[in-house]
C-alpha cells in the first residue's frame, strides 16, 4: 500500500500538533520553580505592628495561628496557608 501525499501531510500535521500540545501544556503548581501563590497566603493588614521590628513577630504570630510560617510583604504580615 502506497502512502499518498494527503496521508503523509495529514500524518505530519498530526505529529506537529501532538508535539506542540505536549510542549506548551500548562505547568502545575507542583512544578519546580513556583513560589508562593497569592491564594496560598493569608495577609493581616489590620496588624502592621507585626512587621515593624522585623519578621520575628510575624513568624511567631503565624505559628500561633497554626500556619506554616510568616513573612512580611510590603510591611504587612502574611502567613503561608
Curated annotation (Swiss-Prot):
Coiled coil: none annotated. It is found in: Secreted. One of its GO terms (cellular component) is extracellular region. One of its GO terms (biological process) is killing of cells of another organism. Residues 1-24 form the signal peptide. Transmembrane segments: none annotated. Keywords: Antimicrobial, Disulfide bond, Fungicide, Plant defense, Secreted, Signal. Disulfide bonds join 43-79, 51-72, 58-77, 62-78. The keyword Signal applies. Belongs to the DEFL family. This is Defensin-like protein 107.
Amino acid at each position: 500500500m502506497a502512502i499518498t501525499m494527503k496521508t503523509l501531510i495529514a500524518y505530519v500535521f498530526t505529529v506537529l500538533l501532538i508535539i506542540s500540545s505536549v510542549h506548551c501544556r500548562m505547568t502545575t503548581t507542583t512544578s519546580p520553580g513556583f513560589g508562593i501563590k497569592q491564594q496560598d497566603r493569608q495577609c493581616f493588614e489590620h496588624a502592621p505592628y507585626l512587621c515593624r521590628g522585623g519578621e520575628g513577630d510575624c513568624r511567631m504570630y503565624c505559628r500561633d495561628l497554626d500556619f506554616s510560617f510568616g513573612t512580611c510583604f510590603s510591611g504587612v504580615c502574611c502567613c503561608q496557608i
